[in-house]
Every structure is written in structure tokens, then in C-alpha cells.
Regions:
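Active-site "substrate specificity/gating" loop of NAD(P)-dependent dehydrogenases
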Residues: 20-24, 64
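Catalytic tyrosine of NAD(P)H-dependent dehydrogenase/reductases that use a Tyr as the general acid/base
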Residues: 27
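Active-site-adjacent segment of SDR/Rossmann-fold oxidoreductases
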Residues: 1, 19, 35, 40-50, ...
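A glycine/serine/threonine-rich, flexible loop-to-helix segment
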Residues: 43, 47, 54-75, 109-119
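Hydrophobic structural elements of the Rossmann-like NAD(P)H-binding subdomain
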Residues: 10, 52-55, 96, 101
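C-terminal helical subdomain
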Residues: 72-165
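Residue(s) in the substrate-gating loop at a strand-loop-helix junction
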Residues: 14
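Active-site helix of classical SDR
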Residues: 30
Length: 168
């Protein structure tokens, strides 16, 4: 793919990885790992026009047969998911997206991080976290990062501001 300066990779994730599903801890962990692999390969392949995505299908399959009522099983046909794979593997595919697909519905899953709170210098403790929990968990101003170092930079900036440090 690097040599031809073009490539498309589509991993299969799952709502069991994105949101959890009772009794599927091993399956959910493996499917969530696809997001980490996608994120890293996206960063490594972007300069070579390699686009990497995940599909999170919801379909009536051998794994879900007997778990879903028959009308739902029929509605969630694998054929209703197939166009998503073709799109994600196409010439104009996006990159670093998790596309959910099922029953003719399509949606993008996004992972966001709250602004958070810095507890330096005196409140870095379980009790400090508990006392600040409402602010730590506040969804206002959530951010979507494009790389792990963006979170590192955010945390360093918050700590420096709290302590009055200049990081430049």
C-alpha cells in the first residue's frame, strides 16, 4: 500500500466493543482493540493515502440467531450492511471513522473526552477526584482528539496553568 501510495483498510468492530454486551467480555475487548489499531494505522498511513476505518455492523447472523425476534433478525440482514463496507473501501472513503450499520441505518461512533479538572497541588487523591467528580464528568466542552499526544498536551497545559508554570 505504501509503495502504490494508496490503500483502504476496513476492520470489523462491534457494538459489544463500543458499548459492552453482557457475557461478551472477551469478544468486546477484541472488537474495541480494532479502534486502537485503526487509530494507529491511520496516523502511519495518512501520508501514503492509506485510509483506515472500522465497521460496527448490526446484523442477523449465526451469532445472533435465536437472540433476536424473527422480524428483527430479517430486518437486520447482512445485505443492509454491505454498502457500508463498499463505501469505507472506496476511492473517496474517509479515514479514522467507526461506521455503525444495520437495518438500513448508518451512524458514526465518536469518542470524546471531557475538559476535566486538574487537582494539583494538594487534591491529587481519590477524595479529591470524588469531590471534583461532577466537574470531571461534565460533558460541556468535550473534545475529540486526533492523537494520543493531544491528551498529553491537554493534561500538561492544565497542570502548568494550575501551578503557574511556563512550558515554553
Amino acid at each position: 500500500m505504501r509503495e502504490q501510495n494508496y490503500g483502504r483498510i476496513v476492520f470489523t468492530s462491534s457494538s459489544s466493543g463500543l458499548y459492552g454486551n453482557f457475557g461478551q467480555s472477551n469478544y468486546g475487548a477484541a472488537k474495541m482493540a480494532m479502534l486502537g489499531l485503526m487509530n494507529t494505522l491511520h496516523l502511519e498511513g495518512a501520508k501514503n493515502n492509506i485510509r483506515v476505518n472500522c465497521l460496527a455492523p448490526t446484523a442477523g447472523t449465526a451469532m445472533t440467531e435465536g437472540l433476536l425476534p424473527e422480524p428483527v433478525f430479517k430486518l437486520l440482514s447482512p445485505e443492509a450492511v454491505s454498502p457500508a463496507v463498499v463505501f469505507l473501501a472506496g476511492l473517496d472513503a474517509p479515514s479514522r471513522k467507526v461506521l455503525g450499520a444495520g437495518g438500513g441505518s448508518f451512524a458514526v461512533f465518536k469518542g470524546f473526552e471531557t475538559v476535566g479538572v486538574n487537582l494539583l497541588p494538594d487534591n491529587v487523591s481519590p477524595e479529591g477526584i470524588a469531590a471534583a467528580w461532577d466537574n470531571i464528568n461534565d460533558p460541556a466542552g468535550m473534545q475529540e482528539f486526533t492523537g494520543g499526544f493531544e491528551q498529553t498536551g491537554k493534561f500538561a497545559k492544565q497542570g502548568a496553568e494550575k501551578l503557574g508554570l511556563d512550558l515554553s
